[in-house]
A protein has these predicted regions:
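Autoprocessing Asn-cyclization modules and mimics
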Residues: 106, 114-118, 157, 166-262, ...
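N-terminal beta-propeller domains
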Residues: 1-112, 154-159, 163-199, 260, ...
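Short beta-strand elements that form the blades of beta-propeller/WD-repeat-like
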Residues: 80-86, 141-146, 288-291, 335-347, ...
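Catalytic or ion-translocation cores adjacent to nucleophile or general acid/base/metal-coordination motifs
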Residues: 360-397
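Residue-level signature of beta-propeller blades and closely related beta-rich strand-turn architectures
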Residues: 149, 294, 349, 357, ...
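Structural signature of eukaryotic scaffold interfaces centered on beta-propeller domains
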Residues: 64-78, 125-139, 271-285, 329-340, ...
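Surface loop/turn motifs at the tips and blade-to-blade linkers of beta-strand repeat domains
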Residues: 61, 271-272, 327-328, 371-375, ...
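Beta-sheet repeat architectures centered on beta-propellers
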Residues: 2-104, 332, 404-694
Length: 694
């Protein structure tokens, strides 16, 4: 039998779909792995243990089981927050909490409370709040919220992070200004009375020769069909006199003959308690846009320029409000809006944008909605912008696509960037992007999978409740996905500039708990508390004895203990305490373990004589190139790295370099290498060199 040596120089393709297991003709095959569980691929090509999770807050008492949402809020270049919204009462109340650098803000508005409640009022067409459909957009110190089943509202930050105002955006107190009008059921009559306009255009008075306006409301239209002229009623002075704004100038100020003009009724505010409310929102070029509403799901509403809550279409001047409906040959309910290179409109049936020639602004007179691709996007998952493109989940929830402008096609295209790893996407619920924070990192897209695998392939079994983590670097054409799991289910994820928050559902002491946690590069366990000098809550001060407290959220759970980089014996938390193996010199960490697995593809050396797929193979030697690693196992064998504690330094040194490992036994058809850890400490694999007997 011959010996073959192979070198895998990186892992920049990530975990490959099992359906591609036989595609040894693809170059991506040789830069991929078969399993990538709880690892993070580096844009340079290596792979590391994923960050651990810092425990932040127990949201169970906020009735988080009813639904939660994480909302990033960037007040300035130096002040960023994460807002947690929970459905405190399914009938009418959302509770908001505010976190700065992982610390819960207290005494909100001087109330002594650590939260702010929003009573949404009467729901439009449902009996319970669906927070998955809560959409939001931010401008300066204000964040606007929409949901088709209750009135839009806004939260505005005050003088500090504990001062917030919560206000309803009221379209009913002055509907002529605040809300656009439309006809749901039209009623047209030709009154038996003359009608005399006071002027041909602008704000005018219309006087009838009989009492025809006694039961007419504002917003209704009057149209002459002898000559021309059309006006919108803005005030009813009496049964014979109304004030109106002309939409089409009248021919003259002469009286229009009886039965020669139409009184068009049925006009009403587009949003109301009987018609529902806006679905989605975004700010774009000085306007607030609402995308769709409960009964007008395909209509785009744009505010007056710099008057964000004025949606009065008025005379159609350049700065007036915009009202445009997607008139297409299929149902296109708007699911999301994004302000990018253009105003992008995502719908259930396809993707649209509003082109702007010569960089002109969008106005009522030049607005044109163009169709680009017909993939459709899933409602409730916000598209994310990354390196000039927009990432979105296809309507069926089975593909991650990138909407990007193509100069060759002079339009947008929607490429499937999850094609090589679609098995990692199962019932997606939320999505967030952490942009590259320095020259050594890439964009990290985090996609939270739901709990319903119905309709998904068998290859997707086991990925419910996980996070599909895509490391992206467009310049290097890197899309490297992995799967992140924890002791429980991930529910939501949000990014506060560079901090990644998540909500995790865990079972603690037999009861369901909902914890807010933060991915932390300095931790190697989940739901972890660290002990060190001058801690930030909820971390604790370094103990002077072997008792580590502050662990009530892990009562009854078996935890891992790391003390000055030394892994102590496992311990079952009792009374909120754990016992350390000694007094720490610098720090200690207590948290839940998570398993790391990296498994290579079946060995295929690409010999001139052909494939070796049908032959048995034996791994003879594996030499990983490691970087700052403290523990690693290869095919269940612990590999000694000579990283012994240094007395007095309070840490274990890391190993960097090549580590030759021999003595692997047994022939298999695949000859795969499984890299894992038996201790929760750091490791990074840059490359693999291995010899196989064929």
């Amino acid at each position: 039998m011959s010996r073959v040596q192979q070198y895998q120089s990186g892992f920049t393709v990530g975990e490959l779909d099992p359906l591609l297991r036989g595609r040894i003709d693809l170059e991506q095959y040789y830069q991929s792995v078969a399993v990538a569980d709880n690892v993070l691929f580096e844009p340079q090509g290596g792979v590391s243990r994923r960050p651990g999770l810092k425990f932040v807050f127990d949201a169970t008492a906020d009735n988080a089981a009813n639904g939660v949402v994480l909302i990033p809020f960037e007040f300035s270049t130096t002040q960023n927050l994460m807002i947690l919204g929970s459905v405190f009462n399914t009938a009418n109340t959302i509770r908001f909490r505010f976190f700065v650098n992982g610390i819960l803000q207290t005494n909100i508005n001087g109330s002594g409370n650590t939260y702010l409640d929003r009573t949404v009022g009467t729901l439009y067409s449902v009996s319970a709040i669906d927070i998955d459909k809560l959409y939001y957009t931010q401008n300066a110190d204000t964040i606007v919220f929409t949901n088709e089943n209750f009135k839009p509202f806004k939260i505005t930050r005050g003088a500090n992070n504990s001062t917030w105002s919560l206000t309803t955006i009221d379209f009913t107190s002055n509907p002529d200004k605040n809300a656009p009008y439309t006809v749901f059921t039209e009623a047209v009559s030709q009154p038996n009375a003359t009608l005399t306009p006071s002027a041909v255009s602008g704000a005018i008075t219309l006087t009838a020769s009989a009492s025809v306006f006694a039961s007419v409301g504002t917003g209704q239209r009057i149209q002459s069909y002898t000559g021309y002229g059309r006006a919108k009623i803005i005030a009813v002075t009496s049964a014979t006199v109304v004030t109106a704004i002309t939409e089409v100038p009248f021919y003259s100020t002469d009286a229009i003959a009886a039965n020669s003009w139409d009184l068009i009724q049925g006009w009403e505010p587009a949003w109301s308690a009987t018609r529902g409310w806006p679905r989605t929102c975004t700010f774009h070029e000085g306007r607030l846009y609402f995308g769709g509403s409960a009964q007008l799901p395909s209509t785009l509403f744009g505010s007056k320029v710099s008057d964000y809550f004025n949606f009065n279409v008025a005379e159609g001047l350049d700065d007036d409000a915009i009202f445009a409906t997607l008139a297409t040959d299929s149902v296109n309910a708007i699911t999301a809006l994004r302000s990018g290179r253009d105003l992008q409109i995502f719908t259930t049936g396809g993707e649209f944008f509003i082109p702007q020639s010569s960089l002109d602004p969008i106005t009522p007179s030049n607005i044109v909605v163009k169709s680009t691709t017909r993939r459709g996007s899933k409602y409730g998952i916000r598209p994310q912008g990354a390196e000039g493109g927009t990432l979105f989940i296809q309507r069926q929830g089975k593909a991650l696509r990138e909407m990007v402008f193509s100069d060759t096609e002079i339009s947008y295209v929607a490429n499937n960037i999850s094609l090589l790893s679609s098995h990692l996407i199962v019932d997606p619920q939320r999505m967030a992007l952490r942009p590259a924070t320095d020259t050594t990192s890439g964009d990290l897209l985090l996609l939270v999978n739901g709990l319903d695998s119905t309709g998904y392939r068998a290859a997707s079994t086991g990925f419910t409740g996980t996070i599909a983590a895509f490391m992206l670097n467009k310049g290097q054409q890197i899309v490297a996905p992995s799967s992140w799991t924890t002791d429980g289910d991930f529910i939501d994820v949000g990014v506060d500039l560079d901090q990644i928050y998540t909500v995790v559902k865990r079972t603690i002491g037999g009861a369901a708990k909902y914890y807010v946690e933060i991915f932390d590069d300095d931790r190697t366990t989940d739901s972890a508390i660290q002990y060190y000098a001058n801690p930030l809550a909820p971390d604790q001060a370094k103990p002077s004895n072997t008792t580590a407290g502050g662990l009530a959220h892990l009562n009854g759970e078996v935890v891992k203990i790391i003390r000055d980089d030394i892994v102590d014996a496992d311990f079952t938390v009792s009374g909120g305490n754990a016992t350390l193996g000694g007094v720490p010199s610098v720090y200690a960490e207590v948290g839940l373990n998570y398993t790391v697995t990296l498994k290579t593809q079946p060995f295929e050396p690409r010999l001139p004589s052909g494939t070796v797929a049908s032959q048995k193979r034996r791994i003879l030697e594996v030499t990983p190139r490691l970087y700052r690693s403290q523990n690693i196992t290869i095919n269940s064998r612990n590999i000694p790295l000579q990283t012994l504690p240094i007395s007095g330094l309070g840490k274990v040194p890391t190993f960097t370099g090549l580590k030759k490992t021999q003595g692997f036994l047994g022939y298999t058809r695949d000859a795969q290498i499984t890299i894992s850890q038996d201790q929760p400490v750091f490791f990074t694999v840059l490359a693999l060199d291995y010899k196989v007997s064929v």
